[in-house]
Each structure stands twice: as C-alpha cells, then as structure tokens.
C-alpha cells in the first residue's frame, strides 16, 4: 500500500509519516492525540503545537519515527481566520473563559456608533505590532506548571513578553455584531491576546467568538482530513518527504548501512543548515545539520538516524 493511501486496517501499520487533521471546536490537542492512538492503533503519536479548545483548524500529527520532527513545526508561520464578538470580554479572551463584562445589544450598538472609527484604527494598526505579552490563561509553563492553572489559583504571574511578527493581515466584517480578520503570524503569537489588547486599549469588551487555523508553514487546512474521517478509521498518512521542507542528499547503496549505523560518510555537497540523507529509493535515513562554519565534506552532524524496522 502506498504510504499516502487511506488506512484500511490501521492497527497493522508500522510505518511513519504525518497526519493532517481538522481539529474540531471543544477538543484539546491532547484529546486529538489520544483519539488517534485509540482509533488508528499507533503507539507513537505526537503533535506539533497546541490549538486552543475553543479553536478549530489544522493540526499536524507525526506518527512513528516522524515524532522526532515535531519541533520543526513549532517555529513555522501560522495563518488564522478570526471572528470577534463586540460587547463581551472574558479572562481568557475567548468563549471558554469566565465572563468579565457583558453589554446588552443596545449598549453595544450605541458604543459602536460613537467609537467605531477609533476601534477600526486599532484593528488596522495590528500589522505594526512587534511584541506581545502572553495571556495569563495559556498553556505556557512556569516552573513546570501551566500559567492558566496558576492564574486560576490566584498566583501573581510575571509578564511573559515575546517578539512577534505579522506577515499578512486583512480586516473583514466590521459591525456591532461581528468583527472578522485574516492573519498570518510568527510562531507563538496568540490571536485571542490581540483581541484582548485592543479591548484593553479602547476600554470596550471584546472577545474571540471563533478562530480557525488555516495553515502551518506551507501546509493548508484544505489538505487535512476531517475529524469524522478519523473516527471512521479512514485517514491519509502523508510521507515525510511531502511534509518536510528540508533539502535531501541521496546516499549511494554502498553507504546506506554506514549512515544507519551512525557513521559519517563523505558527501558531495552539504546544504545550508538542516537536511535529510535519503536512500536511492528515497527512504529517509538520517536528519542532519551542517556544522557552523563547516566547509569540509564531513562538517555535519546527525540529529537523528532512522534505522529500518
């Protein structure tokens, strides 16, 4: 069976690869991993970054030896479609949190009529933002514990400020009922915190109503299988060469065994930074990284070797 075919009898599968799944609202990233293990029978399943329970969208789940590549996706750019509800705010910035303020429809419409130009200006300034303070309700760890757990216990948290970059931004609907935008951001950017910060700056309650992650790096949501397909046990395994961005260097048959045993071999060329060594059959043998300032044919190191089963 081709590795990119649908799984017909998943519990017999021993191969590695990636699953692209559309996570539904109401499920944590960890919940999705558990479901994959139960439904498909894979013992080794990872994920490449969390997606809030209240959000839906693309999740990349590596299986088998490809779990070694989980960290690769943590630093990828990500795209989202967001819908904001004017007139209500929560401590988490989305509908999962505790309500801090809630205005009536009439109050919201009255405020909007008087201040919509200033509010629009704040939303249009988002592409200029360069730093962001992580929300108190988040999965970030402080001494091994989630910030959200500490916040709920009343522990005072030190602000966790990080640099962010907005690569693309488009403001859509703008009304007292709903504000929407599309955005592409650097890794670690919280979309709900953008909404919370705008709310704080203007003194008007706002929160995320809906958030959909539409891409991670070069991978898009339209490539993902539905959650229903996962429950039916029919889901696509994507081979690593179609998912990973690394350049490849082919290893001759005579050197394959040396690579699998972790011995360096002479390479005709070494790509910049990280790369993959592959067999003539295009099987991934090793994940490598060029040594800093390396110019010699052996100036690289193995990050991970993938022995054959």
Curated annotation (Swiss-Prot):
Q: Which residues are the active-site ones?
A: 52
Pfam families in the cross-refs: TruB_N
Query: Which SUPFAM superfamilies has this protein been placed in?
Result: Pseudouridine synthase
The signal peptide, as residue positions, is none
Q: Which InterPro entries match?
A: PsdUridine_synth_cat_dom_sf, PsdUridine_synth_N, tRNA_psdUridine_synth_TruB
Superkingdom of this protein's organism: Bacteria
One term of GO molecular function = tRNA pseudouridine(55) synthase activity
What EC identifiers does the entry list?
5.4.99.25
> Which GO terms fall under biological process for this protein?
mRNA pseudouridine synthesis; tRNA pseudouridine synthesis
For this UniProt record, the keywords arranged alphabetically read as follows:
Isomerase, tRNA processing
Please report which protein family the annotation says this sequence is part of: Belongs to the pseudouridine synthase TruB family. Type 1 subfamily.
Q: What does this protein do?
A: Responsible for synthesis of pseudouridine from uracil-55 in the psi GC loop of transfer RNAs.
Stated name of the protein:
tRNA pseudouridine synthase B
Q: Which organism is it from?
A: Leptospira interrogans serogroup Icterohaemorrhagiae serovar copenhageni (strain Fiocruz L1-130)
Report the gene name.
Answer: truB
């Amino acid at each position: 069976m081709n590795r990119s075919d649908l799984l017909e009898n998943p519990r017999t599968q021993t191969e590695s690869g990636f699953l692209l799944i559309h996570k539904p609202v109401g499920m944590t990233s960890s919940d999705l991993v558990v479901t994959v293990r139960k439904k498909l029978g894979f013992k080794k399943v990872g994920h490449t970054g969390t997606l809030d329970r209240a959000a839906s969208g693309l999740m990349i789940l590596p299986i088998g030896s490809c779990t070694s590549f989980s960290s690769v996706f943590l630093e990828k750019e990500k795209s989202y479609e967001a819908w904001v509800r004017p007139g209500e705010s929560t401590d988490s910035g989305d509908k999962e949190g505790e309500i801090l303020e809630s205005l009536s429809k009439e109050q919201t419409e009255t405020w909007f009529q008087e201040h919509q130009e200033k509010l629009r200006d704040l939303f249009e300034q988002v592409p200029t933002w360069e730093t962001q303070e992580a929300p108190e309700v988040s999965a970030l760890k402080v001494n091994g514990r989630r910030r959200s757990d500490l916040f709920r216990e009343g522990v005072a948290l030190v602000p966790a400020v990080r640099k962010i970059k907005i690569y693309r931004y488009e403001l859509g609907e703008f009304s007292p009922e709903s504000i929407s935008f599309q955005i592409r951001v650097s890794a670690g950017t919280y979309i709900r915190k953008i909404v919370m910060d705008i709310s704080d700056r203007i003194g008007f309650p706002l929160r995320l109503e809906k958030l959909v992650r539409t891409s991670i790096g070069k991978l898009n949501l339209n490539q993902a299988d539905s959650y229903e397909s996962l429950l039916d046990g029919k889901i696509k395994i994507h081979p690593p060469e179609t998912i990973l961005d690394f350049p490849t260097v082919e290893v001759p048959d005579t050197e394959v065994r040396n690579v699998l045993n972790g011995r360096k071999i002479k390479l005709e060329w070494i790509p910049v930074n990280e790369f993959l060594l592959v067999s003539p059959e295009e099987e991934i043998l090793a994940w490598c990284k060029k040594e800093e300032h390396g110019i010699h044919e052996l100036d690289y190191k193995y990050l991970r070797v993938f022995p054959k089963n």
